């Protein structure tokens, strides 16, 4: 009797240990809650405004931290040391995890901005704390899910998540976003902020509950890979395999409508891996090969029709980007302007020079409000000043350029915004004591410089500008490897 009671208690304990993972898989991705954070320090220096409004990530990160603490507590109370000692694979995983954690902590200690390093920047919130959570979540899941029967506690939460995300995605594709409905306003918005909620018009693009379509790509590639394996598994019943296949196809439609090239590449690579793994079984039967080819062709054709050609367009774009990355254009010449109509401003003392695709415009400050204009050849440029609107407009070739004075301008101080076709590019500030210099939208002085870059020549726009990001990130890593 005691043995039965003990086994029953162990069963309950084991089932309870699955709960944090189930919540992490089925609930956390769906969490949306409006949160306002007042910014200070270096974050306020580079952020637009002194407040961050966050709907997608702040609440998720808080729940992740709470669930990770629960996981750590369960691990301490229930997992035996003998289990860890006997598992050779786990030992290797622990070594790798400790190396990652060690470098992360060391990097945080060396950081000049420890608050950002620890808690992360606005919107993402992925600093040291969340990275530690990710590692602990991974280790906990590995330790808790030991038997084949335990797999259902991963499978069913992901089915639930996929269905809910699928409904949200469908509503966004149809332009009837569920997240814009009144009942969602009640869930997402605290009482004091309910009046500031405005429905989002995404134009039919898909972002689910993940803030951006690129994150939809990451989500979809994981879900599709997972359910593709289950669809091909002989250990699952036929009705369930049909459900898995339906989730795979429907998630694929959402992925295509999200226009995430990274997600499509991820799915493509995982499907290639699956093909290699199952190739022996597939090629044993000609009927199976024929059936598989027909299934793939039908799925691709239907998906392309449903998405109105987006699948084909995205696939072509991926190959074009891949060619740019793998094959350097021999005719490519580095252009620091990147085709911007206004690409630089140099300011010092009584002179500011605006560099545009139409030529160079020099501004001479006699004082803060008495300006004279010349071109690169020092020839005068005709300018018309509107006293009511406090702006300067110019004769050709600078007719698309406009300078707008701030309402606080005087003979000793002025701020001038540089517009090109109604878009602001730079702000010039002038004081009697210091002359002319550039300021950002927060009012901080800076000098406009070309960022050092490394690699990705002619392919900087590949993968949603990831080529540009990496080409500017690599020099930073080389300078600060830890």
Where are each of the predicted segments found?
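TM-adjacent membrane-interface loops and short helices in multi-pass inner/ER membrane proteins
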Residues: 212, 341-391, 395-397, 405-412, ...
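Membrane-interface coil-to-helix junctions
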Residues: 34, 42-61, 95, 132, ...
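Juxtamembrane membrane-water interface segments that cap and precede transmembrane helices
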Residues: 38-57, 111-117, 192-209, 468
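Non-cytosolic membrane-interface motifs at loop->transmembrane helix junctions
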Residues: 117-128
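Transmembrane alpha-helical insertion/packing segments
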Residues: 26, 39-47, 90-119
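Alpha-helical transmembrane segments of multi-pass inner-membrane proteins
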Residues: 2-32, 60-76, 96-111, 128-140, ...
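Membrane-interfacial, low-structure loops and terminal tails that flank and connect transmembrane helices
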Residues: 1-11, 81-90
């Amino acid at each position: 009797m005691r043995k039965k009671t003990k086994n029953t208690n162990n069963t309950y304990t084991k089932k309870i240990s699955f709960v944090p993972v189930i919540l992490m898989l089925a609930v956390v991705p769906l969490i949306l809650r409006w949160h306002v954070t007042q910014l200070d320090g270096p974050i306020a220096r580079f952020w637009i405004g002194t407040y961050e409004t966050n709907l997608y990530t702040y609440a998720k990160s808080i729940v992740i931290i709470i669930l990770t603490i629960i996981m750590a507590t369960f691990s301490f109370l229930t997992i035996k040391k003998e289990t860890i000692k006997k598992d050779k694979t786990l030992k290797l995983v622990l070594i790798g995890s400790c190396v990652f954690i060690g470098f992360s902590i060391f990097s945080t200690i060396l950081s000049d901005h420890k608050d950002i390093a620890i808690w992360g920047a606005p919107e993402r919130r992925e600093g040291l704390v969340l990275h530690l959570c990710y590692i602990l979540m991974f280790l906990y899941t590995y330790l808790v899910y030991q038997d084949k029967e335990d797999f259902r506690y991963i499978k069913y939460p992901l089915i639930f998540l996929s269905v809910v995300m699928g409904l949200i995605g469908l509503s966004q594709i149809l332009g009837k976003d569920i997240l814009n409905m009144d009942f969602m306003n009640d869930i997402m918005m605290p009482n004091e902020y309910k009046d500031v909620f405005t429905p989002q018009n995404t134009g039919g693009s898909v972002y689910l509950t993940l803030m951006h379509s690129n994150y939809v790509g990451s989500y979809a590639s994981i879900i599709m890979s997972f359910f593709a394996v289950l669809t091909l598994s002989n250990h699952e019943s036929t009705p369930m395999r049909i459900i898995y296949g339906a989730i795979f196809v429907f998630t694929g439609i959402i992925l295509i409508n999200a226009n995430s090239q990274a997600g499509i590449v991820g799915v493509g690579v995982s499907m290639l891996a699956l093909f290699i793994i199952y190739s022996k079984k597939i090629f044993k039967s000609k009927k199976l090969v024929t059936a598989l080819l027909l299934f793939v062709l039908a799925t691709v054709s239907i998906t392309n029709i449903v998405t109105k050609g987006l699948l084909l367009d995205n696939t072509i774009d991926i190959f074009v980007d891949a060619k740019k990355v793998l094959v350097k254009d021999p005719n490519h010449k580095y252009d620091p302007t990147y085709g911007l109509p206004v690409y630089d401003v140099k300011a010092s003392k009584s002179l500011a020079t605006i560099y545009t695709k139409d030529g160079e415009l020099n501004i001479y400050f006699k004082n803060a409000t008495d300006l004279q204009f010349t071109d690169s050849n020092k020839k005068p440029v005709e300018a018309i000043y509107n006293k009511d609107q406090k702006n300067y407009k110019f004769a050709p070739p600078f007719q698309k350029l406009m300078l707008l004075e701030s309402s606080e301008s005087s003979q000793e101080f002025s701020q001038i915004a540089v517009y090109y076709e109604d878009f602001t590019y730079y702000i010039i500030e002038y004081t009697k004591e210091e002359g002319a210099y550039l300021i950002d939208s927060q009012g901080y002085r800076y000098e406009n410089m070309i960022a050092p870059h490394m690699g990705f020549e002619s392919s900087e726009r590949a993968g949603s500008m990831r080529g540009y990001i990496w080409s500017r990130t690599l020099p930073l890593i080389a300078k600060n490897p830890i």
